[in-house]
């Protein structure tokens, strides 16, 4: 009798357990599906977050944009010329609108300069430098968005 009960219990349990061969195939299929899903998710994540641009965060000539006595005539905002009496707004606007300049001496070739303006340029010539124009700063030469 005990043997009969034991046989019934084993057959009942066996009905709910898959054979080893079927279980491995199902597991292999699930692993393959997981791998496909994860690879698709990785591709989607790569497309959702494209490579970032290599922007220059620390511009080596940032001091010439108004933080020192020397002013970069190609990249500085017109308000920087407030430090030099007589240049702002008229001559500063001419300097900003006629660049870029290869050298400080090119400032004297600005069309329409008066004799007085050339004298002012000569007075402050030692405080000017002509660095390579940087698009991030050239665009802000007239309006850098800073208001008092």
UniProtKB/Swiss-Prot annotation:
It is a peripheral membrane protein. Keywords: Chloroplast, Electron transport, Membrane, Photosynthesis, Photosystem II, Plastid, Thylakoid, Transit peptide, Transport. It is found in: Plastid, Chloroplast thylakoid membrane. GO terms for biological process: photosynthesis; photosystem II stabilization. The keyword Lyase does not apply. InterPro entries: PSII_PsbU. Residues 1-32, 33-54 form a transit peptide. Belongs to the PsbU family. PSII is composed of 1 copy each of membrane proteins PsbA, PsbB, PsbC, PsbD, PsbE, PsbF, PsbH, PsbI, PsbJ, PsbK, PsbL, PsbM, PsbT, PsbX, PsbY, PsbZ, Psb30/Ycf12, at least 3 peripheral proteins of the oxygen-evolving complex and a large number of cofactors. It forms dimeric complexes. The oxygen-evolving complex may be composed of PsbO, PsbQ', PsbV and PsbU. One of the extrinsic, lumenal subunits of photosystem II (PSII), which stabilize and protect the oxygen-evolving complex. PSII is a light-driven water plastoquinone oxidoreductase, using light energy to abstract electrons from H(2)O, generating a proton gradient subsequently used for ATP formation. Stabilizes the structure of photosystem II oxygen-evolving complex (OEC), the ion environment of oxygen evolution and protects the OEC against heat-induced inactivation. This is Photosystem II extrinsic protein U, chloroplastic. The gene is psbU.
């Amino acid at each position: 009798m005990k043997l009969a009960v034991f046989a019934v219990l084993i057959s009942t349990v066996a009905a709910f357990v898959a054979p080893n061969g079927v279980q491995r195939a199902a597991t292999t299929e699930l692993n393959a599906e997981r791998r496909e899903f994860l690879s698709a998710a990785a591709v989607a994540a790569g497309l959702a977050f494209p490579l970032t641009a290599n922007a220059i965060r620390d511009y080596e000539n940032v001091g010439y944009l108004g933080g020192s006595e020397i002013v970069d005539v190609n990249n500085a905002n017109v308000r920087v010329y407030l430090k030099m009496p007589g240049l702002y707004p008229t001559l500063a606007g001419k300097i900003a609108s006629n660049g870029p300049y290869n050298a400080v001496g090119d400032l004297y070739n600005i069309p329409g300069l008066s004799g007085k303006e050339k004298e002012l340029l000569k007075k402050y010539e030692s405080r000017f430098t002509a660095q390579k124009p940087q698009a991030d700063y050239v665009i802000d030469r007239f309006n850098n968005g800073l208001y008092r």
